[in-house]
Amino acid sequence: MTKPVPYNATWEALVPTPTIEFWFDFASNYSYLSVMRIEAAATRLDVRIGWKPFLLGPIFQSFGWSNSPFMLQKAKGDYMWQDIARECQKIGVPWTRPSTFPSGSVLPLRVALVGADQPWIGAFCQRIMLRNFAQDRDINTPEAVSEELTALGLPAKAILTEAQSDANKQRLREQTHAAQIRGIFGAPTFFVGDAMFWGNDRLDDALACAAALQSNPHPLHTG
C-alpha cells in the first residue's frame, strides 16, 4: 500500500531549488531583454538562476562568421532593430539603438564571471545592459565598469583586479569553450538540465520547465 509520509521540515532541505542556466553576452541585444526580466520572473516561480557569461564572438567565428549575423544579413538586421524596439516597449524597458553594434564586452563579462554567484550579479548585469542599450555608452573600459560597480556600492578596484587576473581570463575562455561544447550558437540561451532553450522568447518556457521539475516536498513512502 502506498501512503504519504507525515510532513517533516527536513524534506525541504532535501529538495533542490530548480535551476535555469542563463548564458548571455552583454553585446547581445536579445540578452538585454532577458537580463532585464529574468530575476523577477524566476523569483515568481521559485527558480534559481545560474548566471553564465560567455563570449559570442568565438562562437560566431567557429561558424565562419566575421560579425553578428544581424550585421551580415541586412534584411535580418533591419527586422531585428524593429523587433527589439517593439519588445522593449512591450516589457517596459528603455531602448536606444547603440551607435556601435555589437559592442566590445570582454571586461564586463569578466566581472560578471567574478560575480556570478554573488548577490549583486543581477543588478550589475542590468546596469551594464542599460548602459549599452538604453544610454548608448561604452561598457568595455575600466572606467565604465568601475562606474557601475561603484554605483552599486561595491569595491570596484578589487573586483576589477580579480576580473583582470590571468586565472579569471582563462575562466572566461573556458566558459566560452563550454558554451561551444554544449551546442550554444547564440544568446541568450537557457538550459534546464540538458534541455536547451534559445532566445529571449523562450525564457518563459525555460522557466516553466525548471519550475515543473520541482520535486514533491511530501514524497510518498511505499510499504
Predicted regions and their residues:
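C-terminal cap of thioredoxin/glutaredoxin-like
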Residues: 7, 11-21, 25-47, 127-223
